[in-house]
A protein has these predicted regions:
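PRPP-associated nucleotide enzymes
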Residues: 1-325, 329-331
Length: 331
Protein backbone atom coordinates (compact mmCIF):
# COMPACT_ATOMS: atom_id res chain seq x y z
CA UNK A 1 0.00 0.00 0.00
CA UNK A 2 1.33 3.41 -0.99
CA UNK A 3 1.86 5.63 2.06
CA UNK A 4 0.28 8.57 0.19
CA UNK A 5 -3.13 6.86 0.12
CA UNK A 6 -3.62 7.65 3.81
CA UNK A 7 -3.43 11.42 3.26
CA UNK A 8 -6.41 13.77 3.26
CA UNK A 9 -6.43 13.91 -0.56
CA UNK A 10 -7.38 10.22 -0.69
CA UNK A 11 -10.06 10.40 2.01
CA UNK A 12 -13.20 8.66 0.77
CA UNK A 13 -11.59 7.26 -2.39
CA UNK A 14 -10.04 4.10 -0.97
CA UNK A 15 -12.51 2.22 1.20
CA UNK A 16 -13.52 -1.34 2.04
CA UNK A 17 -16.93 -0.98 0.38
CA UNK A 18 -18.28 1.44 -2.19
CA UNK A 19 -21.89 0.68 -1.29
CA UNK A 20 -23.55 3.69 0.32
CA UNK A 21 -25.69 2.98 3.37
CA UNK A 22 -29.11 4.16 2.17
CA UNK A 23 -32.47 3.58 3.82
CA UNK A 24 -36.10 4.23 2.85
CA UNK A 25 -38.07 3.80 6.10
CA UNK A 26 -41.84 4.20 6.34
CA UNK A 27 -44.11 5.92 8.79
CA UNK A 28 -47.11 4.03 10.14
CA UNK A 29 -49.32 5.79 7.61
CA UNK A 30 -47.31 4.32 4.74
CA UNK A 31 -45.51 7.56 3.91
CA UNK A 32 -41.79 7.20 3.35
CA UNK A 33 -38.53 9.11 3.38
CA UNK A 34 -35.03 8.66 1.99
CA UNK A 35 -31.99 8.59 4.28
CA UNK A 36 -28.30 8.52 3.28
CA UNK A 37 -26.26 7.44 6.31
CA UNK A 38 -22.96 8.00 4.45
CA UNK A 39 -21.81 11.20 2.77
CA UNK A 40 -21.87 11.33 -1.04
CA UNK A 41 -20.38 14.81 -1.37
CA UNK A 42 -18.26 15.07 -4.52
CA UNK A 43 -18.76 11.43 -5.50
CA UNK A 44 -20.33 9.79 -8.52
CA UNK A 45 -23.56 8.26 -7.23
CA UNK A 46 -24.98 5.12 -8.87
CA UNK A 47 -28.51 4.25 -7.79
CA UNK A 48 -29.75 0.82 -8.89
CA UNK A 49 -33.34 -0.26 -8.46
CA UNK A 50 -35.66 -3.02 -9.59
CA UNK A 51 -39.12 -1.52 -9.95
CA UNK A 52 -40.55 -5.03 -10.47
CA UNK A 53 -39.48 -6.43 -7.08
CA UNK A 54 -42.87 -7.15 -5.55
CA UNK A 55 -41.37 -9.34 -2.78
CA UNK A 56 -40.64 -6.29 -0.61
CA UNK A 57 -43.34 -5.19 1.83
CA UNK A 58 -44.20 -2.24 4.03
CA UNK A 59 -46.98 -1.56 6.53
CA UNK A 60 -49.89 0.83 5.97
CA UNK A 61 -51.97 1.35 9.11
CA UNK A 62 -51.22 -2.19 10.23
CA UNK A 63 -51.80 -3.84 6.83
CA UNK A 64 -49.02 -5.43 4.77
CA UNK A 65 -48.59 -3.87 1.35
CA UNK A 66 -46.38 -5.19 -1.45
CA UNK A 67 -44.05 -2.71 -3.14
CA UNK A 68 -45.38 -1.68 -6.55
CA UNK A 69 -43.37 -0.03 -9.35
CA UNK A 70 -44.87 3.28 -8.21
CA UNK A 71 -43.53 2.70 -4.68
CA UNK A 72 -40.04 1.88 -5.96
CA UNK A 73 -40.01 4.98 -8.16
CA UNK A 74 -41.07 7.16 -5.23
CA UNK A 75 -38.22 5.71 -3.13
CA UNK A 76 -35.77 6.47 -5.95
CA UNK A 77 -36.78 10.13 -5.88
CA UNK A 78 -36.44 10.17 -2.09
CA UNK A 79 -32.86 8.88 -2.27
CA UNK A 80 -31.98 11.47 -4.93
CA UNK A 81 -33.52 14.17 -2.74
CA UNK A 82 -31.54 12.91 0.27
CA UNK A 83 -28.31 13.50 -1.68
CA UNK A 84 -29.25 17.18 -1.63
CA UNK A 85 -27.33 18.08 -4.77
CA UNK A 86 -24.00 17.16 -3.13
CA UNK A 87 -23.08 14.27 -5.46
CA UNK A 88 -20.81 15.06 -8.43
CA UNK A 89 -22.89 13.03 -10.86
CA UNK A 90 -26.03 10.99 -10.30
CA UNK A 91 -26.51 7.89 -12.43
CA UNK A 92 -29.65 5.77 -12.26
CA UNK A 93 -29.45 2.10 -13.28
CA UNK A 94 -33.03 1.02 -13.89
CA UNK A 95 -32.86 -2.32 -15.79
CA UNK A 96 -36.63 -2.43 -16.31
CA UNK A 97 -37.49 1.10 -17.38
CA UNK A 98 -40.37 2.33 -15.23
CA UNK A 99 -43.56 2.85 -17.28
CA UNK A 100 -41.71 1.87 -20.48
CA UNK A 101 -44.88 0.39 -21.97
CA UNK A 102 -46.64 3.74 -21.60
CA UNK A 103 -44.32 5.42 -24.11
CA UNK A 104 -46.90 6.66 -26.60
CA UNK A 105 -50.32 8.23 -26.44
CA UNK A 106 -53.50 6.62 -27.72
CA UNK A 107 -56.37 8.98 -27.05
CA UNK A 108 -56.51 10.87 -23.75
CA UNK A 109 -53.65 9.10 -21.96
CA UNK A 110 -50.72 10.16 -19.85
CA UNK A 111 -47.17 9.81 -21.20
CA UNK A 112 -45.78 8.34 -17.99
CA UNK A 113 -42.39 7.19 -19.25
CA UNK A 114 -41.52 10.58 -20.73
CA UNK A 115 -42.74 12.30 -17.56
CA UNK A 116 -40.54 10.03 -15.45
CA UNK A 117 -37.43 10.76 -17.53
CA UNK A 118 -38.00 14.50 -17.40
CA UNK A 119 -38.69 14.39 -13.66
CA UNK A 120 -35.45 12.53 -12.93
CA UNK A 121 -33.30 14.83 -15.05
CA UNK A 122 -34.96 17.87 -13.45
CA UNK A 123 -33.85 16.43 -10.10
CA UNK A 124 -30.23 16.36 -11.27
CA UNK A 125 -29.82 12.88 -12.74
CA UNK A 126 -27.10 12.91 -15.42
CA UNK A 127 -27.34 9.40 -16.86
CA UNK A 128 -30.07 6.76 -17.03
CA UNK A 129 -28.99 3.21 -17.88
CA UNK A 130 -31.63 0.65 -18.78
CA UNK A 131 -31.83 -2.65 -20.65
CA UNK A 132 -33.92 -3.39 -23.74
CA UNK A 133 -36.22 -0.41 -23.35
CA UNK A 134 -39.65 -1.23 -24.77
CA UNK A 135 -39.14 1.65 -27.23
CA UNK A 136 -35.71 3.35 -26.95
CA UNK A 137 -37.07 6.40 -28.79
CA UNK A 138 -38.58 7.51 -25.49
CA UNK A 139 -35.14 9.07 -24.86
CA UNK A 140 -36.34 11.89 -27.13
CA UNK A 141 -38.00 13.25 -23.97
CA UNK A 142 -34.52 14.10 -22.57
CA UNK A 143 -32.31 14.82 -25.62
CA UNK A 144 -29.66 16.71 -23.62
CA UNK A 145 -29.09 14.01 -20.97
CA UNK A 146 -27.46 10.60 -21.02
CA UNK A 147 -29.67 7.61 -21.83
CA UNK A 148 -28.36 4.09 -22.50
CA UNK A 149 -30.59 1.19 -23.56
CA UNK A 150 -28.36 -1.87 -23.44
CA UNK A 151 -29.05 -5.13 -25.28
CA UNK A 152 -28.65 -8.58 -23.70
CA UNK A 153 -28.20 -10.40 -27.03
CA UNK A 154 -24.69 -11.72 -26.28
CA UNK A 155 -25.77 -13.12 -22.91
CA UNK A 156 -28.77 -14.89 -24.47
CA UNK A 157 -26.52 -16.57 -27.04
CA UNK A 158 -24.02 -17.55 -24.33
CA UNK A 159 -26.54 -19.11 -21.94
CA UNK A 160 -28.53 -20.79 -24.71
CA UNK A 161 -25.36 -22.54 -25.88
CA UNK A 162 -24.43 -23.43 -22.29
CA UNK A 163 -27.92 -24.75 -21.50
CA UNK A 164 -28.65 -26.71 -24.70
CA UNK A 165 -25.92 -29.04 -25.99
CA UNK A 166 -27.11 -30.09 -29.45
CA UNK A 167 -27.84 -26.77 -31.18
CA UNK A 168 -26.90 -26.27 -34.83
CA UNK A 169 -26.42 -22.55 -35.47
CA UNK A 170 -27.15 -22.24 -39.19
CA UNK A 171 -30.09 -21.21 -41.34
CA UNK A 172 -30.97 -24.83 -42.17
CA UNK A 173 -31.52 -25.81 -38.55
CA UNK A 174 -32.47 -22.65 -36.65
CA UNK A 175 -34.63 -19.55 -37.04
CA UNK A 176 -35.32 -16.39 -35.02
CA UNK A 177 -38.90 -15.24 -34.45
CA UNK A 178 -40.33 -11.90 -33.32
CA UNK A 179 -43.68 -12.41 -31.54
CA UNK A 180 -44.98 -9.02 -32.73
CA UNK A 181 -44.09 -6.06 -34.95
CA UNK A 182 -42.67 -4.10 -32.00
CA UNK A 183 -39.88 -6.63 -31.45
CA UNK A 184 -38.65 -6.70 -35.05
CA UNK A 185 -35.50 -4.72 -34.30
CA UNK A 186 -34.34 -7.19 -31.63
CA UNK A 187 -35.08 -10.20 -33.83
CA UNK A 188 -33.31 -8.72 -36.87
CA UNK A 189 -30.19 -7.99 -34.80
CA UNK A 190 -30.21 -11.44 -33.16
CA UNK A 191 -30.67 -13.17 -36.54
CA UNK A 192 -27.93 -11.12 -38.23
CA UNK A 193 -25.42 -11.83 -35.45
CA UNK A 194 -25.98 -15.59 -35.82
CA UNK A 195 -26.49 -15.59 -39.60
CA UNK A 196 -30.04 -16.97 -39.36
CA UNK A 197 -33.33 -16.32 -41.11
CA UNK A 198 -36.11 -14.61 -39.19
CA UNK A 199 -39.86 -14.46 -39.16
CA UNK A 200 -42.48 -12.51 -37.27
CA UNK A 201 -46.02 -12.62 -35.99
CA UNK A 202 -48.44 -9.75 -35.98
CA UNK A 203 -51.45 -9.48 -33.70
CA UNK A 204 -54.94 -9.17 -35.10
CA UNK A 205 -56.96 -7.25 -32.51
CA UNK A 206 -60.63 -6.52 -32.00
CA UNK A 207 -60.67 -2.72 -31.88
CA UNK A 208 -64.38 -2.66 -31.01
CA UNK A 209 -63.69 -3.97 -27.49
CA UNK A 210 -61.46 -3.08 -24.54
CA UNK A 211 -60.51 -5.80 -22.02
CA UNK A 212 -58.21 -4.95 -19.10
CA UNK A 213 -57.35 -1.66 -20.76
CA UNK A 214 -56.37 -3.17 -24.12
CA UNK A 215 -57.99 -4.30 -27.35
CA UNK A 216 -58.13 -8.13 -27.13
CA UNK A 217 -55.97 -10.21 -29.49
CA UNK A 218 -58.04 -12.26 -31.94
CA UNK A 219 -55.20 -14.20 -33.59
CA UNK A 220 -51.44 -14.28 -34.20
CA UNK A 221 -50.62 -14.27 -37.93
CA UNK A 222 -47.20 -15.49 -39.13
CA UNK A 223 -44.96 -13.89 -41.76
CA UNK A 224 -41.82 -15.81 -42.69
CA UNK A 225 -40.31 -18.89 -44.30
CA UNK A 226 -41.00 -22.53 -43.41
CA UNK A 227 -40.13 -23.47 -39.80
CA UNK A 228 -40.68 -27.22 -40.19
CA UNK A 229 -37.92 -29.26 -38.53
CA UNK A 230 -36.08 -26.18 -37.23
CA UNK A 231 -35.25 -24.99 -33.73
CA UNK A 232 -36.78 -21.54 -33.24
CA UNK A 233 -35.85 -18.78 -30.81
CA UNK A 234 -38.63 -16.34 -29.92
CA UNK A 235 -36.93 -13.09 -28.86
CA UNK A 236 -38.74 -10.29 -27.01
CA UNK A 237 -38.19 -7.67 -24.31
CA UNK A 238 -40.48 -9.15 -21.66
CA UNK A 239 -42.83 -11.89 -20.60
CA UNK A 240 -45.75 -10.27 -18.79
CA UNK A 241 -48.57 -12.78 -18.37
CA UNK A 242 -46.92 -14.97 -21.02
CA UNK A 243 -50.13 -15.79 -22.87
CA UNK A 244 -48.98 -14.23 -26.15
CA UNK A 245 -45.62 -16.02 -25.93
CA UNK A 246 -47.30 -19.40 -25.41
CA UNK A 247 -49.79 -18.71 -28.23
CA UNK A 248 -46.91 -17.93 -30.59
CA UNK A 249 -45.01 -21.05 -29.47
CA UNK A 250 -48.12 -23.21 -30.01
CA UNK A 251 -48.57 -21.79 -33.51
CA UNK A 252 -44.92 -22.57 -34.33
CA UNK A 253 -45.33 -26.15 -33.08
CA UNK A 254 -48.49 -26.43 -35.21
CA UNK A 255 -46.27 -25.48 -38.15
CA UNK A 256 -43.98 -28.39 -37.12
CA UNK A 257 -41.10 -26.48 -35.56
CA UNK A 258 -38.65 -28.87 -33.87
CA UNK A 259 -38.00 -27.04 -30.57
CA UNK A 260 -39.10 -23.66 -29.26
CA UNK A 261 -36.86 -21.50 -27.06
CA UNK A 262 -38.21 -18.27 -25.55
CA UNK A 263 -35.62 -15.57 -24.75
CA UNK A 264 -36.80 -12.37 -23.08
CA UNK A 265 -34.91 -9.81 -21.04
CA UNK A 266 -37.53 -9.50 -18.30
CA UNK A 267 -39.52 -12.43 -16.94
CA UNK A 268 -42.39 -10.86 -15.00
CA UNK A 269 -44.76 -13.88 -15.06
CA UNK A 270 -47.59 -11.75 -13.70
CA UNK A 271 -50.07 -14.66 -13.82
CA UNK A 272 -47.72 -17.23 -12.30
CA UNK A 273 -46.01 -20.24 -13.88
CA UNK A 274 -48.87 -22.71 -14.36
CA UNK A 275 -49.35 -22.08 -18.08
CA UNK A 276 -45.61 -22.40 -18.72
CA UNK A 277 -45.53 -25.66 -16.76
CA UNK A 278 -48.37 -26.97 -18.93
CA UNK A 279 -46.72 -25.73 -22.13
CA UNK A 280 -43.48 -27.49 -21.15
CA UNK A 281 -45.26 -30.74 -20.26
CA UNK A 282 -47.17 -30.65 -23.56
CA UNK A 283 -43.99 -30.04 -25.58
CA UNK A 284 -45.01 -26.55 -26.71
CA UNK A 285 -41.89 -24.89 -25.27
CA UNK A 286 -38.50 -26.43 -24.48
CA UNK A 287 -36.68 -23.68 -22.58
CA UNK A 288 -37.38 -20.14 -21.35
CA UNK A 289 -34.47 -17.74 -20.85
CA UNK A 290 -34.83 -14.53 -18.85
CA UNK A 291 -32.25 -12.39 -17.08
CA UNK A 292 -31.69 -11.66 -13.40
CA UNK A 293 -32.29 -7.95 -14.06
CA UNK A 294 -35.65 -8.23 -12.27
CA UNK A 295 -36.76 -10.14 -9.18
CA UNK A 296 -36.75 -13.93 -9.59
CA UNK A 297 -38.66 -16.03 -7.04
CA UNK A 298 -37.08 -19.31 -5.95
CA UNK A 299 -39.95 -21.19 -7.57
CA UNK A 300 -38.93 -19.86 -10.99
CA UNK A 301 -35.26 -20.76 -10.53
CA UNK A 302 -36.22 -24.37 -9.77
CA UNK A 303 -38.31 -24.89 -12.93
CA UNK A 304 -36.90 -27.54 -15.35
CA UNK A 305 -37.71 -25.34 -18.34
CA UNK A 306 -35.99 -22.22 -17.01
CA UNK A 307 -32.49 -20.91 -17.84
CA UNK A 308 -31.26 -17.98 -15.75
CA UNK A 309 -29.21 -15.44 -17.72
CA UNK A 310 -26.82 -13.76 -15.27
CA UNK A 311 -26.12 -10.11 -16.11
CA UNK A 312 -24.12 -9.19 -12.97
CA UNK A 313 -20.69 -9.11 -14.61
CA UNK A 314 -22.02 -7.16 -17.59
CA UNK A 315 -23.51 -4.44 -15.37
CA UNK A 316 -20.25 -4.19 -13.41
CA UNK A 317 -18.28 -3.66 -16.63
CA UNK A 318 -20.76 -1.01 -17.82
CA UNK A 319 -20.54 0.93 -14.56
CA UNK A 320 -16.75 0.76 -14.64
CA UNK A 321 -16.67 2.27 -18.15
CA UNK A 322 -19.16 5.01 -17.28
CA UNK A 323 -17.28 5.90 -14.09
CA UNK A 324 -14.02 6.52 -15.98
CA UNK A 325 -15.91 8.31 -18.80
CA UNK A 326 -15.08 5.68 -21.42
CA UNK A 327 -17.47 4.88 -24.30
CA UNK A 328 -19.75 1.88 -23.78
CA UNK A 329 -19.85 1.19 -27.53
CA UNK A 330 -16.98 0.85 -29.97
CA UNK A 331 -17.44 2.24 -33.47
Amino acid sequence: QNENTSTLNFAGYKRDSYIVNAKTPRFGSGEGKGVLVDSVRGHDLYIMLDVCNYSLEYTVCGFKNHMSPDDHYADLKRVIAAAGGKARRINVIMPFLYESRQHKRTGRESLDCALMLQELTDMGVDNIITFDAHDPRVQNAIPLKGFESVSATYQFIKYLLLGVDDLHIDSDHMMVISPDEGGMGRAVYFANVLGLDMGMFYKRRDYTKIVNGRNPIVAHEFLGSNVEGKDVVIIDDMISSGESMIDVAAELKRRKAKRVFCATTFGLFTNGFKKFDEAYENGVIDRVLTTNLVYQPEELLSKPWYINVDMSKYIALLLSLIHISEPTRRS
